[in-house]
């Protein structure tokens, strides 16, 4: 499968009271990958929300991945995204199988990306590229890093960190395969605006 386009990431606080409606609005606009990201300890709610997302993703033909929780991903039969503090990638690959999508956070490090590739990652994620609401203290990444990664890492490259429709085009031009977006997508005031933004992000890959 080709990993290229909009990579939507949920935020349970940002989407409070409109979780499934705004996610479905994004899916209507076109989402390549949807990541369920919830850092709470409410395992029951996380399972219910993830199950709801899986049903939506199946309806729209979108791949669902879970942030930081390989066991929940295995329970649902979906992929996982692992940060640098979430444990090694190899056990997750063994748990989820060869076909599962597994992503790895690499911050601004080509070495981490090459290590992730050697351990069986499906894609690598660099960032933050701009000021991030979700992770304001994350290491800064650059367009030069993106170009170097494009030459050295033979995997799809996701970019994250403060990405909006106003600043995303240069990232695609310099080799990004996936635009990972939270607030720039789900911060919209209406479901219709979420759909419009999703379509606009995807249009950047068509030009």
Curated annotation (Swiss-Prot):
According to its UniProt record, which reaction does this protein catalyse? Answer: 2-[(2R,5Z)-2-carboxy-4-methylthiazol-5(2H)-ylidene]ethyl phosphate + 4-amino-2-methyl-5-(diphosphooxymethyl)pyrimidine + 2 H(+) = thiamine phosphate + CO2 + diphosphate; 2-(2-carboxy-4-methylthiazol-5-yl)ethyl phosphate + 4-amino-2-methyl-5-(diphosphooxymethyl)pyrimidine + 2 H(+) = thiamine phosphate + CO2 + diphosphate; 4-methyl-5-(2-phosphooxyethyl)-thiazole + 4-amino-2-methyl-5-(diphosphooxymethyl)pyrimidine + H(+) = thiamine phosphate + diphosphate
Has keyword Phosphoprotein?
no
SUPFAM superfamilies (alphabetical): Thiamin phosphate synthase
InterPro entries named in the record = Aldolase_TIM, ThiamineP_synth_sf, ThiamineP_synth_TenI, TMP_synthase
Please name the top-level EC class of this enzyme.
transferase
One GO CC term, this protein: cytoplasm
Pathway given in the UniProt record: Cofactor biosynthesis; thiamine diphosphate biosynthesis; thiamine phosphate from 4-amino-2-methyl-5-diphosphomethylpyrimidine and 4-methyl-5-(2-phosphoethyl)-thiazole: step 1/1
The EC code for this enzyme is: 2.5.1.3
Keywords (alphabetical) are: Magnesium, Metal-binding, Thiamine biosynthesis, Transferase
Which cofactors go with this protein? Mg(2+)
Where is 2-[(2R,5Z)-2-carboxy-4-methylthiazol-5(2H)-ylidene]ethyl phosphate annotated to bind?
A: 132-134, 162
What Pfam families has UniProt attached to this entry? TMP-TENI
Residues noted as binding 4-amino-2-methyl-5-(diphosphooxymethyl)pyrimidine in the record, renumbered to the chain: 35-39, 67, 105, 135
Question: GO molecular-function annotation terms?
Answer: magnesium ion binding; thiamine-phosphate diphosphorylase activity
Q: What does this protein do?
A: Condenses 4-methyl-5-(beta-hydroxyethyl)thiazole monophosphate (THZ-P) and 2-methyl-4-amino-5-hydroxymethyl pyrimidine pyrophosphate (HMP-PP) to form thiamine monophosphate (TMP).
Query: PANTHER family in the record, alphabetically?
Result: THIAMINE-PHOSPHATE PYROPHOSPHORYLASE, THIAMINE-PHOSPHATE SYNTHASE
Q: Which family does it belong to?
A: Belongs to the thiamine-phosphate synthase family.
The protein here is known as Thiamine-phosphate synthase
What species was this sequence derived from?
A: Pseudomonas entomophila (strain L48)
């Amino acid at each position: 499968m080709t990993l290229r386009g909009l990579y939507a990431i949920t935020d349970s606080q940002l989407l409070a009271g409109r979780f499934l409606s705004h996610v479905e609005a994004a899916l209507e606009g076109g989402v390549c990958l949807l990541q369920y990201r919830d850092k709470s300890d409410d395992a029951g709610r996380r399972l219910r929300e993830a199950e709801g997302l899986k049903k939506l993703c199946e309806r729209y033909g979108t791949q669902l991945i879970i942030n930081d929780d390989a066991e929940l991903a295995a329970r649902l039969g979906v992929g996982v995204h692992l940060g640098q503090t979430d444990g090694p990638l190899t056990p997750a690959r063994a748990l989820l199988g060869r076909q599962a999508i597994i992503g790895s956070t690499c911050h601004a490090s080509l070495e981490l990306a090459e290590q992730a590739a050697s351990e069986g990652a499906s894609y690598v994620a660099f960032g933050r590229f701009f000021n991030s609401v979700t992770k304001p203290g994350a290491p800064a990444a650059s367009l030069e890093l993106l170009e170097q990664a494009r030459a050295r890492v033979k995997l799809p490259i996701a970019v994250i960190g403060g990405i909006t429709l106003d600043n995303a085009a240069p990232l695609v031009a310099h080799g990004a395969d996936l635009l990972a977006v939270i607030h720039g997508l789900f911060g919209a005031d209406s479901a219709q605006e979420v759909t419009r933004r999703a379509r606009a992000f995807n249009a950047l890959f068509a030009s």
